[in-house]
A protein has these predicted regions:
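N-terminal secretory signal peptides
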Residues: 1-12, 24-31, 38-40
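Short, solvent-exposed loop/helix junctions and linker helices
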Residues: 11, 60-64, 105, 210, ...
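N-terminal export leaders
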Residues: 14-21
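N-terminal leader/capping segments at the start of a protein or of a new domain
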Residues: 18, 27, 32, 46-50
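Short, low-complexity N-terminal intrinsically disordered segments enriched in polar/charged residues
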Residues: 22, 41-83, 87, 182-230, ...
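A beta-strand edge to alpha-helix "cap/lid" segment located at domain peripheries
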Residues: 45-57, 116-211, 265-273, 278-340
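A solvent-exposed, acidic/Ser-Thr-rich amphipathic alpha-helical stretch
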Residues: 68, 79-139, 229-284
Length: 340
C-alpha cells in the first residue's frame, strides 16, 4: 500500500488556492497547519499531493473515490512495478491505446508483458503523476505527466480517458501533443499508418457518463460541427475559460469564446462537418468526450469539460496531436485569438 500524505506544495497555482479556499471550509493555505489526515478522510476538492512530486492534484470536479483510485494507480506505476500496476486493470475487458503513437493492447497479458519491458529501463526518479481529474468511478478524464526518461527524452503531458468497472480500468486512451514531446521523436515512435488502430473499443465499456455530461457534450459537438460559434457560446458560464493546449490559446468569457470558435471553424480539428463524438465519460460536473475527424490535420482528440451546478461549461480544455499540424495552422489559430 502506498502511503501518501496531504500537504500544500509549491506546485499549487493561484487558481487552485482560490478553489481550495472556496470549497470545503478549510482552504489549501491552512491545510499545512493541520495534522496530516488519512487518505480516506480527505475530500478531493481540498487537494491531494503525490509522492515525490511538488504538485497538488486538482480534484475539484472529481469524486473523492476516483481521485484516490487514480492517485494510487499512478503512484504504483511510478514505482515501476508491473505487477502492482496491473492490479488496477480489469482482466476482461481491457483496452489500452496511445492515441498519438498507435501503441495498443487488447488483453491483460500483453499489457503486462509491455510494462515488464518498459519499466525496468525507467530512471529511478521517474514519475507518472496526475495534475487534474474530472469524473467519477465509472469514468474520468485524467490529466497526467510522464516525466522525461519513461518513454523518451522529453516529458509527456497527457489526458487519459479512463473507464472503470468495480474499481478496475477497463479502457484507457491517452491523448497528448506530439509537438511538446518533439515532432521527430514522436514520428520515430509512431506505428505506420496502416497499423494504426481503427477501433478504440469504446463499445466494450458502453456509455456510462452522467446524462448532464452527455447532453452538454453532444450540444457542444453539434455546434462545433456546424461552425456555430454563437450556439457554442450559449453553453458556457459567464466566467468560462476555453483553452486549446497544442495551439497555446486561452480565451475567457462566452462572447470571446464564441467569436473565436466562429473564426476558427475551418481550422480547429474538432470543428467542421467531418467531426463526431467517439465516447463520453464523467459525472454531472466533470468529464468530456473523445472526438474523431474525417478531414483535417488531426483525426482524433479529446475535449475535457468542467461544468457548474447549472450545467454550464466553466472550463474547456482541448487536447490533440499538434505534431500533425503544420506551423502555419498553429500561427493562424493564435492570430484568430487577437481581439479587435
Amino acid at each position: 500500500m502506498v502511503r501518501i500524505s496531504k500537504q500544500a506544495g509549491n506546485g499549487m497555482t493561484r487558481r487552485g488556492l482560490l478553489q481550495g479556499a472556496a470549497v470545503g471550509g478549510v482552504g489549501i493555505a491552512g491545510a499545512s497547519l493541520l495534522p496530516a489526515p488519512t487518505a480516506s478522510a480527505v475530500g478531493a476538492s481540498n487537494g491531494f499531493v503525490f509522492p515525490g512530486v511538488d504538485v497538488v492534484i486538482d480534484g475539484s470536479h472529481a469524486t473523492t473515490d476516483v481521485t484516490l483510485l487514480v492517485r494510487e494507480y499512478l503512484a504504483r506505476k511510478s514505482e515501476a512495478d508491473p505487477d502492482g500496476t496491473m492490479t488496477f486493470f480489469s482482466r476482461n475487458p481491457v483496452t489500452y491505446i496511445d492515441a498519438v503513437l498507435g501503441w495498443s493492447w487488447y488483453d491483460w497479458d500483453s499489457l503486462r508483458t509491455a510494462l515488464g519491458q518498459f519499466m525496468p529501463n525507467w530512471p529511478k526518479e521517474g514519475k507518472s503523476y496526475p495534475t487534474r481529474i474530472l469524473g467519477n468511478s465509472t469514468g474520468a478524464m485524467v490529466f497526467f505527466t510522464d516525466t522525461a526518461g519513461l518513454f523518451g527524452s522529453s516529458e509527456i503531458r497527457a489526458v487519459g480517458v479512463i473507464n472503470f468497472s468495480d474499481r478496475r480500468i477497463t479502457r484507457q486512451i491517452d491523448y497528448w501533443d506530439g509537438r511538446h514531446f518533439g515532432i521527430s521523436d514522436t514520428a520515430k515512435l509512431r506505428v505506420p499508418t496502416d497499423k494504426f488502430p481503427a477501433d478504440f473499443r469504446e463499445s466494450t465499456v458502453g456509455e456510462t457518463a452522467a446524462q448532464t455530461m452527455k447532453n452538454v457534450s453532444y450540444k457542444l459537438a453539434r455546434a462545433l460541427r456546424n461552425g456555430d460559434g454563437a450556439g457554442a457560446a450559449d453553453l458556457f458560464a459567464p466566467g468560462a475559460v476555453f483553452e486549446d493546449v497544442p495551439a497555446h490559446v486561452q480565451i475567457v468569457g462566452p462572447r470571446s469564446i464564441g467569436s473565436y470558435l466562429t473564426g476558427t471553424a475551418s481550422l480547429l480539428p474538432y470543428s467542421g462537418q467531418g467531426t463526431a463524438v467517439r465516447h463520453i465519460v464523467g459525472s454531472a460536473t466533470g468529464g468530456g468526450y473523445e472526438w474523431t475527424a474525417a478531414d483535417g490535420s488531426a483525426s482524433r482528440g479529446v475535449i475535457a469539460l468542467e461544468l457548474d451546478s447549472w450545467g454550464k461549461i466553466t472550463r474547456l480544455t482541448a487536447m490533440w496531436d499538434g505534431s500533425q499540424a503544420d506551423d502555419s495552422m498553429l500561427v493562424s489559430l493564435s492570430q484568430k485569438a487577437i481581439e479587435r
